[in-house]
Regions:
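Helix-to-loop junction immediately C-terminal to a conserved catalytic motif
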Residues: 12
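Conserved ABC transporter NBD signature motif
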Residues: 20-35
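ABC-family P-loop ATPase nucleotide-binding domains
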Residues: 41-100
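Catalytic Walker B motif of ABC-type/P-loop ATPase nucleotide-binding domains
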Residues: 112-116, 121
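Helix N-cap at the start of a conserved alpha-helix in ABC-type nucleotide-binding domains
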Residues: 123-125
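ABC ATPase "signature
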Residues: 172-173
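C-terminal coupling/interaction segments
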Residues: 203, 207-257
Length: 257
């Protein structure tokens, strides 16, 4: 089964696909030297020499990538209280993640893949890292692909959403479009069920007497039918990205509390 980390590694040309072809500008990606500089993957896997000091890794990265934003790197190292003279194997999981993300933000690649860039980070460090991702984008707009399970925290960072479930892409759309088509419809069960007839229900739950259906209307409609009368006891609202992600990947399940 193809997971997100495996997919990113294939796209970054770090591993080969068992079937199919990845193309870069209509040319197979495998073996293309220019793609190695155009795409950069930061992942949980540590590809750096564990005995190297951070400053050595940054210097080698600059040679390999052709450039490196040392000014931004120095600023981030100071803010995260990382000593460039440390060896990478002396860092904790969280600080190793931070350093690898620093390197990713400072290379000149047009496509930067960040696979779980907040692994092992506390809340304060996560907020600081998000700020630097935005700063790196504002300084030089390019494509950042963030792979994470903590969706709620990155919702304000992203413009486009791709949701992968059981090796299938189930959502590939702009964030605004996804949110515009995501609904929560709540009220007494009989009223909710009556209103939601023939609508694309993802999941349902019941807490006491409150019954809720979750819908993603982009499957069948551009919006909820305008001619359908909303019962007085039924409330309809949009839901956030975290909620719709959960409901999309657990669709068909009914929960009772």
């Amino acid at each position: 089964m193809l997971g997100k980390s495996t997919l990113l590694s294939i796209l970054a040309n770090q591993i080969s696909a068992s079937s199919g072809t990845i193309k870069w500008n209509k040319t197979p990606l495998t073996g293309r030297d220019h793609s190695l500089q155009a795409i950069y993957l930061m992942s949980e896997q540590n590809l750096f020499n564990k005995e190297n000091r951070l400053k050595k890794i940054m210097k080698d990265t600059a040679l390999l990538q052709g450039a490196f934003n040392q000014t931004l790197a120095d600023k981030m190292l100071a803010d995260f209280e990382l000593n460039p003279k440390q060896k990478i194997n002396q860092l904790s999981t969280g600080y190793r993640t931070i350093f690898k993300t620093i390197v990713a933000l400072c290379v000149p690649a047009d496509y930067v893949f960040l696979d779980e860039p907040i692994l092992g980070l506390d809340a304060n460090h996560r907020v600081l890292l998000y700020r630097y991702i935005l700063e790196a984008y504002e300084n030089r707009p390019r494509t950042f692909v963030l792979s994470t399970h903590i969706i709620e925290e990155i919702a304000n960072l992203i413009e486009h959403v791709l949701i992968l479930d059981q090796s299938r892409i189930i959502i590939d759309d702009d964030l605004e479009t996804v949110l515009d088509h995501s609904y929560q419809i709540s009220g007494p069960k009989e009223d909710v069920l009556a209103y939601c007839q023939e609508l694309p229900i993802l999941a349902s739950e019941q807490i006491g007497t409150l019954y809720t259906n979750y819908l993603y209307t982009n499957y069948l409609y551009t919006e909820l039918p305008a001619d359908r009368v909303i019962p007085d006891r039924v409330a309809i609202k949009h839901v956030d990205l975290q909620t719709i992600f959960i409901k999309l990947t657990e669709k068909g399940r009914e929960q009772h509390v």
